[in-house]
Amino acid sequence: MGEVFKMDGLASTILEVHKPAKLEDIPDEDPIAIILALKWLEYLCERAGVENVSDILDFYYMLGWLGDKALAKLLKFLKGIKVDEENVVEGSGKLNITDHIISLLFIERLNGKKISAELLDKIEWELRKIKKGAEQFYGI
């Protein structure tokens, strides 16, 4: 009676408690949040093409950046978006690191966090430092 079972790695991963996503929902009553969400989707469409955005959003969901409600609303908004082909960046339909960072900034802003010019400068400085370190390390 009252046996304790120890879970191995796979079982604990499967039964892992759901952690809240960075963005759980986009409030319907907040027009600024809706505008930001639409501008973010427009950005993603222009960077990767409309046909690839649902895969990108699914990727963010798998990372824990988006919750169920936020993902559902973004996909609903996406159905009504048309982007002029002349604004779409030619490429593989995938995003680069900078694009993912910008997406994360949109998510933080949708959560009500202010993104100051100082914060953006600090992020840019950190990225330059990392890039310089990688160039020195890998001899690029």
Curated annotation (Swiss-Prot):
- Does the record bear Cell inner membrane in its keywords? no
The keyword Transferase is assigned to this record: no
| Gene Ontology terms: biological process | archaeal or bacterial-type flagellum-dependent cell motility
Q: Where in the cell is it found?
A: Archaeal flagellum
One GO CC term, this protein:
archaeal-type flagellum
InterPro entries documented for this protein: Arch_fla_DE (IPR006752), Flagella_assembly_related (IPR052494)
What the entry lists under Pfam families is as follows: Arch_fla_DE
Q: Tell me which UniProt keywords the record has, alphabetically.
A: Archaeal flagellum
Give the UniProt family note: To M.voltae FlaE, also to FlaD.
**Could you tell me what this protein is called?**
Putative flagella-related protein E
Q: Which species does this protein come from?
A: Methanocaldococcus jannaschii (strain ATCC 43067 / DSM 2661 / JAL-1 / JCM 10045 / NBRC 100440) (Methanococcus jannaschii)
Q: What is the lineage of its organism?
A: Archaea, Methanobacteriati, Methanobacteriota, Methanomada group, Methanococci
Q: Which gene encodes it?
A: flaE
